[in-house]
Amino acid sequence: MGSTGRICLELAKMMEKKGHNCRIIYGRKKATKESGEYGMRMTSSFGVYIHGVETRILDNHAFASTFETLRLLFFLKIYKPDLIHLHNLHGYYINVAVLFRYIITNKIPVIWTLHDCWSMTGHCSHFYHIGCNKWISGCHNCQQKKEYPASLVFDKSKKNWEKKKKIFTSLDCAVIVTPSIWLSELVNKSYLNKYQIKVVPNGIDLNVFYPRDDSMFSKKFGYKKIILGVSNVWTENKGIYDFINLVDMLDASKFQIVLVGEVKKDFEIPSNIYIIDRTDSTDELAKIYSSADIYVDLSKIEVLGTTIIEAMACGCPIVTYGAGGNSESIGEYGGRIIEKQNLSSVVDAIQQMAFLDKNVIRGACVQQAKIFSKEKMLENYYLLYKKLVNYE
């Protein structure tokens, strides 16, 4: 389960504790044991595949899966939600036109948390790293047509931007939530600026993410300093190539790179990068963070680095590019921000920080992470829920 899934699960558990009913509708992969109590998958692997084909050929992302979305509407007609909290509407599983038509017809209040920029563009989920501003006045001739959600044939970015603008600005009662100030400023420049925009930083469970025993890697790697990276799936935008290049820039006798997450076969990973398959256990993840000496985030763009916050909560200092909202996560004491994507500067920061007093640096990181507690996030969302549907 990724960070967005964990947020949804925590919100569902909170609502249940307060005496309300909540269901999580999701598109892909199996639910965990914990999330299965609340979750309902709305499409099959075959449905995801067909949606993917339409995306690859027709650039029809989020306008396929009509049958699956109609099946969702059948559930909603029975469930009769007082409020719908939207998260990611991309991912090969839903038809946004069908969904929004139902929401508008039934006048259901909406909170929409944006975890990227897809809702503002005709195609891509992020544009900041390539300096594109077409999304402000109208996408066309997309430079990232072959990036997620990739289209290998047609470029419908102009038409898709127009369709999304018409659909996404048609809600009667909606609040847009962003996890970072950085993303809220982008939303203010987009067609979504007709709605109220609220910043609610992602929160983490500080009862799970806290400094643990730090000896997980000592038997395997001895006294080497552990440089850690975590991602659900490693991609170019998540910095996989920079980690590969980092191997040759660090002294192998002093440093060991450890990456957690799915690494696709397309990438030739050096044998001296240690890979841990993606884990759904937050307890295991907290132990991994606690055993690292430095957490390195080399993403080209991040809305708000939730894994950065988790690492800090476990006492691990950060080295990261100043991409998107990452600087909001780290604050003044959580680590080092590299403003330009310069690997030499990353290496310098790693070498300087790796040999600082670990106890002192841990305390500073833990204090910074407390700003992003799960409880603060949940309370902010609950206040929004009450405001939109007027319940106590």
Where does each model-flagged region fall?
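Nucleotide-activated donor-binding/catalytic signature segment of Leloir-type glycosyltransferases, i.e.
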Residues: 261-286
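Short hydrophobic beta-strand element within catalytic cores of glycosyltransferases
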Residues: 317-320
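Short acidic/histidine- and often glycine-rich active-site loop of Leloir-type glycosyltransferases
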Residues: 268, 323-337
